Amino acid sequence: ILNDQVQQSLKAKPMEEVDRISLSKYFAYIDLDHVSEYCYVDNKKNLYTRSYSKIPYQYFEDSLLVQQLGSSYADTRWFVMKDYLFGTGEEALFVGRKVHSLNYAHEPGYLFFKMNPEFLQSLLLEEDTLTQEAAIGIMDPQGRICAYWYPEGFTLSPEQEAVLADYAQTQGYGSLVENEKISGGILSVYKQEECGFSVFTLVPERVLGK
């Protein structure tokens, strides 16, 4: 965002072709672990993507990614939606924000990262040890479970799914509930303020009875 070439792309004067190529290379060489695709769009409808594919601007508009940012000036937003930009049509985790010029009052650009499935798994350390007994999952702000690690033979009941969705949509952040007895086990839920995603841990009754 603070890169000189990124800032130059937001000026009123269009960039020279050599500068646009240089900006494409800048994005290409950034260390983007866990990012499967990215898309930077300047305020003159030029797209820069990881695959160097010629994605038309209309595809970007039709993808509805910008609408997910709402009226936020420059907040980073995490959201799960179907990928209509890169052609998969499957649900994926995106991280996006508006990119503003630091010196001029121009229209913003947009930067979106499409994260690969392993990204959410990397957020939980020692998952193999934890999931031998407890069920662990990550939910988006709407309560949809984006990633999970369950003990062998474990599945959530519809009642448990409803309880989790209610907590995910609850206002407030931090520890929403800790060691609460619900049907089928003991539940804890922590909601991250920066992204609105929640992590839950459910210890099944069969473990409590050991």
Q: Where would I find each of the regions flagged by the language model?
A:
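Extracellular/periplasmic ligand-binding regions of membrane signal-transduction receptors
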Residues: 1-21, 37-54
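Generic short beta-strand
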Residues: 38, 97, 135-138, 143, ...
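Short, hydrophobic beta-strand elements of compact beta-sandwich sensory domains
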Residues: 94-98, 102-117, 179-210
